[in-house]
C-alpha cells in the first residue's frame, strides 16, 4: 500500500527530461526538484547497480576497468520508476531507478574521484585493453 507522503516524493524524483547525447556520451537528466545532471556513460557503467558490478554485499564490488569509451546503445524503460541502459560492452543488467540516478548526480564528483583513486591503487586503466 502506498503511503500518502510517498506520492509527492516520487513525483520529485521522476525526471522531467531524459536525453542521450551520443557524441559527448552523456545522459542528461532534469528532475522536478530543480536539479539537473549530465552523467557520462563511463560513470554510469562503472557505477551500475547490477550485482555483476556491486556484488552481493559490502566489499564484493568489482572494479570496472577499460570503460572510458563505452557507449549506450539502447535504453529500455522499467515500469515508471527506472531505465535499463544497454552498454556497448554488452552490459545490460543494471536497473537504474530514478532515485539511484538522482543520487549518482548529487554525488557525482565524490563518486568519480573515488573511482579514479581505486583505479590508481589497482594500477588499472580506464582505456580498453
Please provide the spans of the model-predicted regions.
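Motif-centric detector for short Cys/His coordination patterns
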Residues: 2-129
Amino acid at each position: 500500500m502506498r503511503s500518502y507522503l510517498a506520492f509527492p516524493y516520487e513525483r520529485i524524483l521522476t525526471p522531467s527530461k531524459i536525453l542521450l547525447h551520443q557524441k559527448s556520451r552523456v545522459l542528461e537528466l532534469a528532475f522536478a526538484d530543480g536539479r539537473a545532471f549530465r552523467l557520462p556513460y563511463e560513470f554510469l557503467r562503472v557505477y551500475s547497480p547490477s550485482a555483476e558490478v556491486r556484488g552481493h554485499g559490502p566489499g564484493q564490488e568489482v572494479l570496472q576497468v577499460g570503460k572510458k569509451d563505452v557507449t549506450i546503445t539502447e535504453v529500455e524503460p522499467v515500469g515508471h520508476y527506472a531505465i535499463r541502459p544497454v552498454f556497448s560492452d554488452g552490459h545490460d543488467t543494471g536497473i537504474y531507478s530514478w532515485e539511484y540516478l538522482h543520487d549518482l548526480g548529487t554525488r557525482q564528483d565524490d563518486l568519480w574521484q573515488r573511482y579514479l583513486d581505486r583505479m590508481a591503487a589497482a594500477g588499472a586503466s580506464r582505456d580498453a585493453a
